Each structure stands twice: as C-alpha cells, then as structure tokens.
Amino acid sequence: MAYPFQLGLQDATSPIMEELLHFHDHTLMIVFLISSLVLYIISLMLTTKLTHTSTMDAQEVETVWTILPAIILISIALPSLRILYMMDEINNPSLTVKTMGHQWYWSYEYTDYEDLNFDSYMIPTQELKPGELRLLEVDNRVVLPMEMTIRMLVSSEDVLHSWAVPSLGLKTDAIPGRLNQTTLMATRPGLYYGQCSEICGSNHSFMPIVLEMVPLPYFEAWSTLMM
C-alpha cells in the first residue's frame, strides 16, 4: 500500500507490476537525458552570442534530429507494447473470480465453486479496530491463493467503476453490460489494498478493495468454511 510522502510506486508483488516498474525506470531515464540535453543547449544559447554558421542550413543535422527522435520513440514503444500483450494474455487460469461494481460496494463470485459469493462493503470509520486502515478496510476480503494464475472478470450493475489494486499492477474498468477480464498472480502472501478508480457518484471514495493472498492449503480451508 502507499504511504504518506511516498515518492515512488508501490512495491511490486506480481510479475506484471515488476515489468511496469522496470518500464517506468526505463522511460524516466530517457526523459531525464532528453531534458538534460535540452537544458544544456538552452543554457549555451543564452550565454553565448556566437553563431555556428555551418549548422544554419545543414542537411546532415536535419537528418540526425529526424532519425534520433524516431529511435527514442521506438525504444519507448516496444517495451510498452510487450507489457500490454502480457497484461492481456491469460493462459490456463487456476481460478476464476467474477467481480461486480455497485453503488457503492463490490460483489464477488467464485465461478469454480457452486455457491461461493459475497458482497464487500467498506467498514465505517467508527467501527474500525486498532491498527486498521481508514477508508480501506472491508467486511469481506477477497481470499485468493498465491503463486497461481487467477482470472478476474469485471463488470458493473449500474454505472462505470474501475477495479484497481496498484501493488499488483491491476486496473480494469467495470462497465455495465460489458465483461472485461484481467489476470493476477501474487508472488508473496499478504493484504493488498485498492480502491474504485473511476468517479462513480457521491460515495466513490468508499469502495475499497482488499485482496488476501494466502498459500493454497489455507485457501482450500477458507473456501470449505465459506460453503
């Protein structure tokens, strides 16, 4: 989860989020180098009155500043496209969970089980226990097995919502009448917090998401208890 005054992104807990962090650093370094070069050229132009006559109308220079930006854009686009394809690829999921957005709560259905479904509401501030997080705790957490490929089917019953868990690199729009899908796999156990990331009405800020990633034996015991 995020902390006050945090400068970077949340710690990656899925292969997709690790790729996104690498891409962020890669792109940020390119932007830093370009910005430094531009500032250096501007400072030279402001501090000297000399004119380089050989570059006033040079075909070679024009060729360079046409080809070089194209190479830079390609170096940014290729890793981005690779990650986009990885995010859309779903191979043999071990579990499928359907989540529906409502004003203003989430409902979940484990489609591989006959009768395993529940609603997930935010716990009001006055009912929080010591150590629990304001506006982020829910009455029913989504318990999932770690280190397994899980397919999430996301839709909405009323208006536009967005199901997002930043530390897992997830953000999928919940659109009425349309079923979107995404995949997740956590590399370590723990609680992962998210929120609705699409303004959906007056209580938009009160639609938290809590995923509890556990080892497979614990998940099997939980699913048996819930049914």
Swiss-Prot record:
Subcellular location per the Swiss-Prot or TrEMBL entry: Mitochondrion inner membrane
Binding site for Mg(2+): E198
Cofactor note (record): Binds a dinuclear copper A center per subunit.
Described purpose of this protein according to its UniProt entry: Component of the cytochrome c oxidase, the last enzyme in the mitochondrial electron transport chain which drives oxidative phosphorylation. The respiratory chain contains 3 multisubunit complexes succinate dehydrogenase (complex II, CII), ubiquinol-cytochrome c oxidoreductase (cytochrome b-c1 complex, complex III, CIII) and cytochrome c oxidase (complex IV, CIV), that cooperate to transfer electrons derived from NADH and succinate to molecular oxygen, creating an electrochemical gradient over the inner membrane that drives transmembrane transport and the ATP synthase.
GO BP annotation list: ATP synthesis coupled electron transport
UniProt keyword Transmembrane, yes or no: yes
SUBUNIT field: Component of the cytochrome c oxidase (complex IV, CIV), a multisubunit enzyme composed of 14 subunits. The complex is composed of a catalytic core of 3 subunits MT-CO1, MT-CO2 and MT-CO3, encoded in the mitochondrial DNA, and 11 supernumerary subunits COX4I, COX5A, COX5B, COX6A, COX6B, COX6C, COX7A, COX7B, COX7C, COX8 and NDUFA4, which are encoded in the nuclear genome.
Binding residues for Cu cation A2: C196, E198, C200, H204
Disulfide bonds: none
Family, per entry: Belongs to the cytochrome c oxidase subunit 2 family.
Enzyme Commission number: 7.1.1.9
Residues annotated as binding Cu cation A1: H161, C196, C200, M207
Topology feature Mitochondrial matrix, residues: 46-59
Protein name per the record: Cytochrome c oxidase subunit 2
Topological type in the membrane: Multi-pass membrane protein
Keywords assigned by UniProt, alphabetized: Copper, Electron transport, Magnesium, Membrane, Metal-binding, Mitochondrion, Mitochondrion inner membrane, Phosphoprotein, Respiratory chain, Translocase, Transmembrane, Transmembrane helix, Transport
Enzyme class (EC, first level): translocase
Cited PANTHER family: CYTOCHROME C OXIDASE SUBUNIT 2 (PTHR22888:SF9), CYTOCHROME C OXIDASE, SUBUNIT II (PTHR22888)
